[in-house]
Amino acid sequence: GATLRDYFSKILPENGWEAMNIPLLINAVDLGDGSTEWFGIGGRLDVSLADAVYASSALPVFYPPLEVDGRAFIDGGTSHPLALRRAHEAGASTIIGVDVGAGETGDVESILEQGILAVHQRIFAIMTWRRRQELVAEWDGPPLIYIRPQLEGYGTFDFDSVEYFLEEGYRAARKALSG
């Protein structure tokens, strides 16, 4: 956990929230009561940007929760895998939803070979993928630009593929924004 937090501290601006050119809200889930906490402009500002990003990334099987004021925060995707409604409530007239979660299919043989943690990760991926699909299909708010990079075959921890992720994200964004 400390290594990931250190990484976020290095790549994100020191002045954090103030450095953002657009409003940014990051969600995390309270491990105790399951409530959603929002960090950023319009939410809590007493947590650094790096810690908020870490909290929203914390999958306890891999990274421990972020502890703040006696509460433990985990991956915000457990309750809001695409926070479309919150973006609308924050005043967005057009919403850009970027979906980088795992898709519908997975290599069962590979998952089973990797063991129970991989099975757990795949179960979580299926649940959140289905929820993201429902959120997009049922969206009745302001215009939604849905960006879905092609990431099938890649996993959460494929750090060696960052260049591909950036290029694919750029391609998917251009495609979505061009209509």
Predicted regions and their residues:
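Patatin-like phospholipase
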Residues: 1-179
